UniProtKB/Swiss-Prot annotation:
Domain of life: Bacteria
Gene that specifies this protein: xerC
Record GO biological process: cell division; chromosome segregation; DNA transposition
Protein name per its UniProtKB record: Tyrosine recombinase XerC
PROSITE patterns noted in UniProt: CB, TYR_RECOMBINASE
Subcellular location: Cytoplasm
Domain Tyr recombinase: 116-298
Core-binding (CB) domain span: 4-95
GO cellular component: cytoplasm
PANTHER family, per database record: PHAGE INTEGRASE-RELATED, TYROSINE RECOMBINASE XERD
Alphabetical list of InterPro entries matching this protein: CB, DNA_brk_join_enz, Integrase-like_cat_sf, Integrase_catalytic, Integrase_recombinase_N, Integrase_SAM-like_N, Tyrosine_recombinase_XerC/XerD, Tyrosine_recombinase_XerCD
Role of this protein: Site-specific tyrosine recombinase, which acts by catalyzing the cutting and rejoining of the recombining DNA molecules. The XerC-XerD complex is essential to convert dimers of the bacterial chromosome into monomers to permit their segregation at cell division. It also contributes to the segregational stability of plasmids.
Length: 305
């Protein structure tokens, strides 16, 4: 049970989240449930009515016991982290309203969330996406831009940041594209004619003149296209055509690797094409020639024609 003054503080906190922080009702409900769970545990832990004094004097042992209980109850690492974040949010609010001094709770680190690999799309979902991303909207060059960018990410396995950095200089070589990836590591990827021709077609109707060293993918007003803008286009695509919720720009890069593997490419060649961190370690033991990469690519890739 809670002291009446705490109940009033919780109501004020909820209003603050909605009116001052612009949180959605669903988010506030989730936060309220997390805080309720914490305060109920505090009530159980202290075996008495929770008061303002309990809130002020809560110690690390209680908080860690609460986190351990959530883990025992099979809460996910993400849910446990959100719960702790909620309680910290509430205490931050108390600092402003009842002048609570900086509290020990802020020194507790959130549990590490498990890093999950993005799911690969099926070949059918990829083909549906490539077919329809150009099929809606009312600005032709923007539609073609979206398709060219999506094809490039999937056909070359690029990160969205890498694809958005492509310039006309990258198009000068008809056979290969040279990418400078994370950690300034260079990798060379065979050009698929299908992807290159689509980009050339897009540049033919792009209403902005670009220097050779300027990124070719532009926003509606001529500035460099931002990842968030393109991801919004993919969200529209998902909604209109009922595509998987996990469809993102990065899922096409992941699908590039998964589909190559399914069609017979070896892991080491895929590592080189993706430019993963482990590439430098792999190169110490095997020197894969560009010609071999091209052969693997042309033999294994499902949209090569």
């Amino acid at each position: 049970m809670l002291d009446i003054s705490i109940q009033e503080l919780i109501k004020q906190w909820q209003k603050y989240l909605i009116l001052q922080r612009n949180y959605s009702n669903n988010t506030v409900i989730a936060y309220n449930n997390d805080l309720k769970h914490f305060l109920e545990f505090m009530n159980y832990y202290n075996s008495e009515l929770v008061t303002i004094n309990h809130i002020k004097t809560v110690d690390i042992r209680l908080i860690r016991s609460w986190l351990a209980k959530r883990k025992y109850e099979n809460f996910t690492a993400s849910s446990i982290a959100r719960g702790l974040s909620t309680v910290k949010n509430f205490y931050k609010f108390l600092e402003k309203t009842i002048l609570l001094n900086s509290h020990i709770i802020f020194s507790i680190k959130s549990p590490k969330k498990a890093k999950l690999l993005p799911k690969a799309l099926s070949v059918d979902d990829v083909l549906i996406s490539l077919e329809h991303i150009e099929g809606y909207g009312n600005v032709k060059w923007v539609e073609l831009r979206n398709k060219a960018l999506l094809v490039l990410i999937y056909a070359a396995g690029l990160r969205i940041s890498e694809a958005l950095s492509i310039t006309k200089l990258h198009l000068q070589n008809l056979e290969f594209i040279k990418i400078i990836g994370k950690g300034s590591k260079e990798r060379i990827i065979p050009w698929l004619p299908f992807a290159r021709n689509l980009i050339t077609k897009y540049l033919g109707i792009l209403p902005y003149k670009l220097d050779e060293n300027e990124p070719i993918f532009r926003g509606k007003h001529g500035k460099k296209l931002q990842p968030s803008v393109f991801n919004r286009e993919l969200i529209k695509l998902k909604r209109v055509y009922g595509l998987p919720e996990y469809l993102t720009a990065h899922s096409f890069r992941h699908s590039f690797a998964s589909h190559l593997l399914e069609y017979g490419a070896d892991l080491r060649s895929i590592q080189e094409l993706l430019g993963h961190k482990s590439l430098s370690t792999t190169q110490k033991y095997t020197q894969t020639s560009i010609k071999h990469l091209e052969a693997v690519y042309n033999t294994a890739y499902p949209i090569k024609k």
